[in-house]
């Protein structure tokens, strides 16, 4: 009987872009961060991404890419217009960042990182999705 063999993994580097001014290709993803985020906001983003994927729009291929895009937009001047809902349940979310975004994330005030990240996600969601 013949042993099953695995074919080598294909390295596919397709350019991924975001809408508007924020055309970014996230390569060299290095570090991982975790924070507690509003579950209702995450569910809204997931549902919107799923409906866009069903319509054939893969501008944001997954949730992590959307998070990186939101942080990148905030780094380049996205105004934080989203107000946090402090009474909503929270869920631990983790995703990876590029070295440049990780440096920017670490430069944020330690006590305000979660708030800034959540507000950046909400602002980016309502402005670009």
Please identify what each model-predicted range represents.
Residues 1-89, 98-129:
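A detector of short terminal or domain-flanking linear segments
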Residues 91-93:
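C-terminal extensions
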């Amino acid at each position: 009987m013949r042993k099953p063999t695995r074919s080598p993994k294909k390295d596919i580097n397709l350019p991924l872009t975001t809408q508007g001014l924020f055309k970014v290709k996230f390569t060299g993803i290095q570090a991982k961060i975790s924070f507690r985020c509003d579950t209702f906001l995450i569910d809204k983003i997931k549902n919107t991404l799923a409906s866009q994927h069903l319509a054939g729009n893969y501008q944001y291929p997954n949730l992590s890419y959307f998070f990186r895009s939101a942080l990148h937009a905030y780094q380049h001047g996205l105004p934080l217009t989203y107000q946090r809902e402090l009474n909503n349940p929270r869920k631990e979310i983790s995703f990876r960042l590029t070295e440049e975004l990780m440096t920017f994330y670490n430069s944020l005030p330690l006590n305000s990182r979660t708030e800034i990240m959540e507000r950046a996600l909400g602002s980016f969601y309502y402005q670009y999705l």
